């Protein structure tokens, strides 16, 4: 299963409807094909999707919407999904997830969700209604109509027959079983501010050597229900730990984060799934971040169409992109918006980091007035 587009209406934090495309918006030249994933003849998907914006612009919120939509089509109960918090107390949120399945059909799943406060004061979410549309991709005349279902009747609608289904699980579960299809999701949303390595039986030595060449051995062992961590640095005695949190005393947060990330990258490239990373530059140096992006953009390595979806503050990372349509600019001006860069910047030959930092794109640089107020405040506190 490949996600083509996600739209969301009625979200409390957003200024207008959210609309994110994962397929190319601009014309695809021969030289572009090396960094894209070919879905079918004339349709290509982005392998690395960037969401950039200043602090508090809403980048994490956009990532949460994507995570929620992916988990809905994966049949996860909404109330078990961490990203459900983006729904807030909304009474009517409509999420449409457009995807391409194993039968070579383009599908649109529309899920309407409502929040209700429980006795404990927490919000509990349920699906009010659901519809599924589908069409063979062979019937699509051009990219313009790829996700257009205007005038078409749904092939399925949620009804009382779904009584056996929990009211927070999508009825797309039946479609997925019939098509023998699913979507693999790996998320680093919860690891943005946590540096604890989860138990893993296999940490590739190549990953460890790339992140920290001084490490000779790092592996987990489980004996009698207890976990032991074996850590050895070159020319040093082996250290044995029994708590993953203790690794922080020996390894940098960048190395721990890197091991978590690159272990997931291996899985995503193998399965053709999705890796969501919030603040990709957090704890990483720029070289490691660009390496990660290049792995996904290498169509020879990324044969199965694994997709990296990330947020960043780093404008320099935009220069890794030859195209504009794999980048979204996130702003928060009385509500969050996410706009595809190809709609704002028509030419690919303008250096993207310069356009971003110069303020040419509007709302991408901290306001000068706020900067001056901060400077005056600091000056007053020093005097």
Predicted regions and their residues:
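C-terminal lobe/lid and adjacent interdomain/linker elements of RecA-like ASCE P-loop ATPase modules
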Residues: 1-2, 291-383
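Pre-Walker A-like glycine/lysine-rich segment at the N-terminus of P-loop NTPase domains
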Residues: 2-67
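Short acidic, glycine-rich loop/turn motifs
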Residues: 8, 97-103, 131-134, 233-238, ...
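Extended helical coiled-coil dimerization/tether regions that scaffold
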Residues: 9, 184-250, 369-383
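Catalytic P-loop NTPase motifs of RecA-like helicase/translocase cores
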Residues: 14, 283-285, 317-318
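Conserved P-loop NTP-binding catalytic core
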Residues: 44-50, 54, 64-116
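Conserved ABC ATPase signature
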Residues: 48-55, 228-266, 274-287
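Electropositive, glycine-dotted interaction segments
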Residues: 112-224
């Amino acid at each position: 299963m490949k996600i083509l587009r996600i739209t969301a209406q009625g979200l409390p934090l957003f200024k207008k409807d959210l609309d994110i495309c994962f397929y190319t918006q601009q014309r695809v030249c021969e030289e572009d094909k090396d960094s894209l994933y070919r879905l079918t003849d004339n349709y290509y998907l982005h392998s690395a999707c960037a969401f950039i914006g200043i602090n508090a612009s809403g980048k994490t919120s956009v990532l949460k919407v994507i995570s929620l939509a992916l988990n809905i089509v994966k049949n996860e109960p909404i109330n078990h999904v961490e990203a459900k918090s983006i729904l807030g107390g909304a009474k009517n949120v409509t999420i449409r997830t457009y995807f391409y399945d194993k039968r070579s059909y383009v599908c649109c799943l529309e899920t309407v969700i409502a929040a209700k406060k429980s006795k404990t004061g927490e919000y509990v979410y349920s699906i009010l209604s659901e519809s599924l549309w589908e069409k063979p991709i062979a019937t699509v005349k051009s990219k313009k109509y790829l996700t257009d279902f205007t005038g078409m009747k749904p092939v399925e609608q949620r009804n009382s027959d779904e009584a056996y289904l929990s009211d927070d699980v999508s009825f797309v579960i039946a479609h997925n079983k019939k098509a023998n299809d699913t979507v693999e999701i790996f998320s680093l949303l919860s690891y943005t501010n946590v540096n604890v390595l989860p138990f893993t039986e296999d940490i590739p030595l190549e990953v460890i050597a790339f992140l920290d060449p001084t490490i000779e051995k790092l592996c987990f062992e489980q004996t009698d229900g207890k976990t032991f961590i074996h850590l050895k640095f070159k020319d040093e005695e082996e250290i044995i730990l029994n708590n993953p949190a203790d690794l922080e005393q020996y390894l940098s947060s960048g190395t721990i984060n890197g091991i978590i990330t690159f272990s997931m990258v291996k899985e995503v490239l193998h399965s053709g799934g999705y890796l969501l990373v919030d603040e990709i530059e957090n704890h990483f140096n720029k070289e490691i971040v660009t390496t990660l992006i290049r792995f996904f953009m290498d169509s020879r390595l990324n044969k199965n169409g694994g997709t990296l979806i990330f947020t960043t503050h780093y404008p320099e990372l935009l220069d890794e992109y030859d195209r504009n349509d794999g980048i979204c600019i996130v702003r928060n001006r009385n509500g969050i918006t996410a706009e595809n860069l190809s709609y704002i910047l028509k030419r690919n030959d303008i250096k993207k980091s310069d356009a971003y930092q110069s303020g040419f794109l509007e709302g991408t640089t901290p306001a000068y007035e706020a900067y001056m107020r901060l400077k005056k405040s600091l000056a007053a506190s020093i005097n």
